[in-house]
Regions:
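Autoinhibitory propeptides
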Residues: 5-88, 94-97, 271
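Short beta-strand
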Residues: 16-21, 165-167, 365-366
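Active-site-proximal beta-strand/loop segments in catalytic clefts of secreted hydrolases
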Residues: 30-31, 51, 110-114, 155-159, ...
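Short, solvent-exposed loop/turn and secondary-structure capping segments
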Residues: 58-64, 118-124, 185, 219-220, ...
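C-terminal subdomain of the subtilisin-like protease fold in secreted/lumenal serine endopeptidases
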Residues: 85, 202, 206-208, 341-387
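Subtilisin-like serine protease catalytic core
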Residues: 94-133, 138-188, 202-205, 218, ...
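Substrate-binding/access-modulating region of protease and related hydrolase catalytic domains
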Residues: 97, 159, 175-269, 295-298, ...
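Extracellular S/T/G-rich loop segment that most often corresponds to the catalytic His/Ser-adjacent loop
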Residues: 112, 123, 265-341, 345, ...
Length: 387
């Protein structure tokens, strides 16, 4: 991003909210629409688009209260994974752990809506959190906002044998907030794009994003099926850069399978990302799991993992169940991280392809299961054979 251009835009009297280098955009806020007309007339500005409108008379919304803590999770001594054992065993991620690959030396960014009580829950205190950043509201407390990201984090990072062990328990984490749970506007894709670039700047290896968009408060912005080509939505274009930057992006397919939309949601339509659908613990498709393919006929979702009755940590510090591709994605993300740790010579795109090729439906992929349930141990063995 050319600093001179950003400064000239700022000098028009607007506040710069975020910038994006990869897609060459600047997001600004102002109270006077004529300022946008002046910016649009600048010789280096290609186009402008309204991505957010402030609620009348309201200050930015943020959470201040916290859910009460119990912090008395049950212990299940039969497995270090606790009740979450089946959601990692289904893809043989536990065999990677037994081989010594638990995410050591790898960094994961979780881009989500908030991480409620993750800083207070006793069972999560040994998760290696390197830092946090809020792209929605710098004055907000990321640990007081939505519980969604906290439950997502628990699927990957929990490291309490007998209570719950996640799919990459020894990885390190950046917790980034890009989703504003109080509204649905295009600006959240701007926040997300900035979060992805920040993750790249701090050395992240793998990203999980259990977010997706197709409908907005401004209905004129809603997506149509033809928009699912990996190029229409800003998130999808940004996501398509991630592997070229040396990171693997794992994202949720969406939960629209039972509604009128049914399809995956951006950024899940992007190229060179792993889009994850949801199954139950018997490997049967969750009815809500969004389906593909993309508008340009690429296979989506890529793979599936447990997302119906997934085991998570709740905001009270005890175990619970959750449904959604929001949880199949991080379960897969952690295993992908451990696989890449085991196969350090591979590029991001090669890791993604290795995971696809290990799926139990690799010979007949479809728009429901994609390439199926990956076998992470088989993927590792295939890597060793080809070295």
């Amino acid at each position: 991003m050319c600093r001179k251009y950003v400064d000239e835009i700022r000098h028009q009297g607007v506040n710069v909210v975020v910038t994006g280098k990869w897609e060459n955009f600047v997001t600004v806020s102002c109270n006077d629409s004529t300022l946008i007309d002046r910016i649009a007339a600048l010789p280096f500005v290609c186009a402008t688009e309204k991505v957010w409108i402030a609620p009348k008379g309201d200050s930015p919304m943020m959470s201040t209260g916290r859910d009460s803590l119990i912090n008395q999770p049950s212990v299940h001594p039969d497995s270090i994974y606790g009740l979450a054992v089946s959601q990692i065993q289904m893809s043989n991620g536990d065999k990677l752990h037994q081989g010594g690959f638990k995410g050591q030396g790898m960094t994961i960014a979780v881009i989500d809506a908030g991480f409620h009580n993750a800083d207070k829950i006793t069972a999560m205190q040994n998760i290696r959190v390197l830092g946090t950043k809020d792209f929605v509201n710098q004055q907000a407390d990321i640990f007081a906002e939505s519980s969604h990201g906290m439950m997502v984090l628990s699927c990957i990072g929990m490291n309490q044998p007998g209570i719950m062990t996640g799919t990459a328990p020894e990885a390190s984490f950046w917790l980034l907030r890009s989703e504003d749970e109080y509204s649905e506007h295009l600006v959240e894709q701007d926040y997300w794009s900035a979060a992805v670039e920040f993750a790249d700047s701090v050395g992240v290896d793998v990203l999980n994003t259990s977010l997706g968009y197709y409908t907005f408060d401004d209905k004129s912005k809603d997506y149509r099926f033809r928009d699912l080509d990996g190029r229409h939505a800003l998130m999808s274009r940004q996501a398509s850069h991630v592997a070229d930057k040396g990171m693997v992006l794992v994202c949720s397919a969406g939960n629209s399978g039972m509604g009128s939309w049914k399809k995956i949601t951006p950024p899940g339509d992007a190229e060179n990302v792993l889009t994850v659908g949801a199954i139950d613990k018997e490997a049967v498709l969750a009815p809500f799991s969004s389906i593909g393919n993309t508008a340009d006929h690429r296979i989506k979702p890529d793979v599936v993992a447990v997302g119906l009755g997934a085991d998570v940590i709740r905001t009270d510090g005890n175990q619970g169940k959750a449904n959604g591709t929001s949880f199949s994605s991080p379960i897969m993300c952690g295993m992908v991280t451990c696989l890449w740790q085991a196969c350090p010579e591979l590029t991001a795109k090669e890791v993604i392809e290795l995971v696809r090729r290990s799926g139990d439906r690799k010979d007949y992929p479809d728009n429901i299961y994609g390439y199926g349930v990956p076998d992470m141990w088989k993927a590792y063995q295939d890597y060793l054979l080809k070295r």
